[in-house]
């Protein structure tokens, strides 16, 4: 492809000088918390997680910040970028000096980095009043509660093959949500969601939308810390037996280790999978002693075996074709259990247990090696013990679990703050090949908490003011063959991330990652520069990826002779704020040899829609987001995104195939508050 060479040269020059051609008419920062958090996080952490759910939680927090002088440990530990030790330092400072007078006093706490302070300004404010408010009266809840109605419509300017023959619905995606809330005490809402291609108001969707979620949550009602009805998510312990909430990857664990792990969250997202339906509640028996109970009954999608059992539990949430609808709500699942945990002077210990059953037996195809130890039958149970300790220097956390398989899974980690600017984290996990839990989600290299032995060593270092260096090295060994393998495999994963902020406007960063797994070696490198003013911000980045697939039985010579797959991406993000209008734009040029050298990039999106996309092949991606706050009640956001490929005549395959080399979408979102 000769035509891309002049484009490459031009864009490379743009990268070298683009960050200098900026407006300097203002002072301050225009960076959003999403941009700041994306620079502290590892993009690939979000490939296998539902970032939308956690982003929604943080966005609501940013809209309703908390008084830092009155914030509880549990509230602060909800933030993914604060460690439990840092939370201890903040609370110790507030206690010692009788509260903060300004958010800038965070600079007096050595363990809080510059980037963390910038993020905290989005979620906290400082008020001298440190009194804890009593639960409001019903009259005040009704009178002073806040309402909001939201809607989103996505319009594609193209047709997929299934739109004309295959999908039973139209090509537009849309959703609606109503929510009522009173501070952090009461939250009530209902969501209706429709994916593109799903029938609206027809067939099984005679009530309109394909998916509805409803929820009611009451917090801080005397000894009742949390009462949640409807659809919700749970996170108990470190997730070895129960976590259908959000979890972070290997880089973010450096800050999230040991954070409050017994959480009940409402399921207010548009995702039609990975939620519980029923009731959950946490009650304080004694000071530091909490009891949680939960019950869930819900329908699930599944494919059936010839014997009528469940072959596979479907988690796509898509019901567009006759075949997909035939799998909809074909079975049911019941879950009941509880957790008890005790906290005192930095120590905590807890126990979790549950029983779950299916209306049809699980019958996986165990003739396939990687499914040899998959759960089978109707009824299952799991139990675990979690434990830990938090002080200024030490953070210790662990969980050990078992179940009706009789096998063991254990995860243990310890973090030590050698100085106020340097900390080490060591983590060990052993997940037996015979162990399973149908609701687990925890730290792992693989996709499941099963068949993995590993050790992880990470560090966080602030060598000087405005510097931040983080990194890790992780080793994992898989005894049993995985998908597409026939023997034991192992994985080495190393990452180094460096941030430098020479002044209040500039931020420079680089990230290096090297990974060997199942015969594939992948190296990734990123270099970026961010410049922020009061009304302007820009981020320029370059990504490079090289990947080599050697195969399980390749000799060393064959491995050395193998041609690597390479690729790069040049990206520019710009944002501008003027009174009631905020504009954000993103432009990317990518060129990779194949999917193995794909590259990930962040681009601005709508509310509750932090976007991390992957690109491979050759092409450009452009996105423009306009956000307008009209008065005190109406918010309108529009996003126009377009991808143009230079190396293909069509996009995707099957019913998702687009018969052109480009695709453009328009998304419109509106929120009315009163």
What residue spans do the PLM features occupy?
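Exposed, low-structure sequence patches enriched in small/polar residues
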Residues: 167-171, 276, 331-365, 372-674
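Bacterial Sec-dependent N-terminal signal peptides
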Residues: 1-33, 674
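N-terminal, intrinsically disordered low-complexity tails/presequences enriched in Lys/Ser/Pro
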Residues: 26-65, 130-144
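Transmembrane beta-strand segments of Gram-negative outer membrane beta-barrel proteins
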Residues: 137-164, 180, 184-190, 227, ...
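Outer-membrane beta-barrel proteins
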Residues: 193-211, 265-272, 326-329, 401-403, ...
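Outer membrane beta-barrel
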Residues: 206-301, 421-437, 582-595
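Amphipathic, charged-and-aliphatic alpha-helical interface segments
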Residues: 51-101, 120-125, 198
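Outer-membrane beta-barrel biogenesis signature
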Residues: 32-38, 111-122, 127-148, 162-165, ...
């Amino acid at each position: 492809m000769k035509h891309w060479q002049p484009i490459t040269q031009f864009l490379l020059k743009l990268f070298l000088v683009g960050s200098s051609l900026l407006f300097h008419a203002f002072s301050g920062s225009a960076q959003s918390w999403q941009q700041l958090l994306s620079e502290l996080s590892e993009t690939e952490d979000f490939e296998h997680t539902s970032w939308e759910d956690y982003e929604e939680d943080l966005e609501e927090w940013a809209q309703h910040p908390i008084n830092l002088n009155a914030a509880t440990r549990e509230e602060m530990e909800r933030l993914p970028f604060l460690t439990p030790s840092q939370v201890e330092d903040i609370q110790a400072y507030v206690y010692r000096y009788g509260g903060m007078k300004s958010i800038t006093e965070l600079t007096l706490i050595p363990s809080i980095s510059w980037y963390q302070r910038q993020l905290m300004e989005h979620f906290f404010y400082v008020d001298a009043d440190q009194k804890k408010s009593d639960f409001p009266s019903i009259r005040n809840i009704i009178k002073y509660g806040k309402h909001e109605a939201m809607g989103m419509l996505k319009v594609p300017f193209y047709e997929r093959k299934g739109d004309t023959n295959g999908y039973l619905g139209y090509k537009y995606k849309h959703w609606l949500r109503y929510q009522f809330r009173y501070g952090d005490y009461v939250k009530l809402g209902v969501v209706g969601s429709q994916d593109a291609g799903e029938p609206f108001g027809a067939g099984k969707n005679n009530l309109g939308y394909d998916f509805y979620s409803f929820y009611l949550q009451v917090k801080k009602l005397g000894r009742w810390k949390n009462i949640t009805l409807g659809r919700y998510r749970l996170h108990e312990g470190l997730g070895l037996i129960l976590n259908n909430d959000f979890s972070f990857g290997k880089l973010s664990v450096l800050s999230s280790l040991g954070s409050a792990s017994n959480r009940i969250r409402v399921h207010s997202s548009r995702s039609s999978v990975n939620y519980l339906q029923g009731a959950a509640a946490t009650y304080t028996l004694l000071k530091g002693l909490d009891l949680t109970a939960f019950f869930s009954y819900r329908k699930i999608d599944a494919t059936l075996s010839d014997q009528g059992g469940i072959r596979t539990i479907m988690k796509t949430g898509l019901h567009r074709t006759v075949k997909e609808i035939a799998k909809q709500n074909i079975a049911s699942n019941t879950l009941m259990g509880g957790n008890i945990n005790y906290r005192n002077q930095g120590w905590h210990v807890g126990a979790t247990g549950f029983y779950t059953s299916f209306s049809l037996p699980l019958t996986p195809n165990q003739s396939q090696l990687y499914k040899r130890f998959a759960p089978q039958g109707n009824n299952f149970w799991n139990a675990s013990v979690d434990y830990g300790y938090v002080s200024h220097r030490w953070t210790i956390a662990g969980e050990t679990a078992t179940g009706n398989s009789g096998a063991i899974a254990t995860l243990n980690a310890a973090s030590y703050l050698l100085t106020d600017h340097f900390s080490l984290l060591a983590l060990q996990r052993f997940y037996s090949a015979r162990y399973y839990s149908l609701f687990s989600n925890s730290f792992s290299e693989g996709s499941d908490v099963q068949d993995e032995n590993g050790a992880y060593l990470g560090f966080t270092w602030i060598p000087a003011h405005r510097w931040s260096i983080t990194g890790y090295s992780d080793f994992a060994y898989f005894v049993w063959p995985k998908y597409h393998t026939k023997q034991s495999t192992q994985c080495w994963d190393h990452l180094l991330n460096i941030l430098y902020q020479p002044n209040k406007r500039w931020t420079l960063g680089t990230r290096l990652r090297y990974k060997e797994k199942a015969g594939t070696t992948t190296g990734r490198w990123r270099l970026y520069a961010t410049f922020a003013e009061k009304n302007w911000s820009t981020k320029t980045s370059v990504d490079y990826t090289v990947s080599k697939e050697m195969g399980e039985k390749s000799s060393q010579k064959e491995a050395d002779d193998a041609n690597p797959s390479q690729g790069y991406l040049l990206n520019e993000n710009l944002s501008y704020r003027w009174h009631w209008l905020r504009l954000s734009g993103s432009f990317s040029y990518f060129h990779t040899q194949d999917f193995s050298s794909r590259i990930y990039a962040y681009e601005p999106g709508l509310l509750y829609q932090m976007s991390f996309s992957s690109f491979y092949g050759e092409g450009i991606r452009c996105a423009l987001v306009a956000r307008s706050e009209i008065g005190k009640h109406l918010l309108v956001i529009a996003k126009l995104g377009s991808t143009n490929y230079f190396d293909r005549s069509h996009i995707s395959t099957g019913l998702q195939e687009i018969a052109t080399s480009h695709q453009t979408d328009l998304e419109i979102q509106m929120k009315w508050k009163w």
